[in-house]
Amino acid sequence: QYYGYPYAAVLPQPVADTPEVASAKAAHFAAYNVAAAAAAAAPDYDAVGVVAPPYPGYSAYVGPLAGIPAIVNGVPADTPEVAAAKVAHFAAHAAANHY
């Protein structure tokens, strides 16, 4: 039968903090506890819980509509630049394939 690894005592241990890191953590938690105690001793009862809603004047796009090429069978038509690029592309394919 299989019972697992025979040397369970040599499993890798988690990475330990260096003395500098441990000291910095202790200083941080001490400062945090001082700040938390000060905040608990003087609660802020005048905090504003509700802010005014944003002004809705700029919530809609009011620019000019873009010129849409004519739609053919539900598909927008190519712009002149795209049509010229397609012609050049297919001409290059035809030249490369010797047609």
Curated annotation (Swiss-Prot):
Start-end of each Sequence repeat: 16-31, 77-92
Residue numbers bearing the Pyrrolidone carboxylic acid modification: 1
Keyword hit for Repeat: yes
Protein name per its UniProtKB record: Cuticle protein 2
Keyword annotations from UniProtKB, A to Z: Cuticle, Pyrrolidone carboxylic acid, Repeat
Domain of life (superkingdom): Eukaryota
An MF annotation (GO) of this entry: structural constituent of cuticle
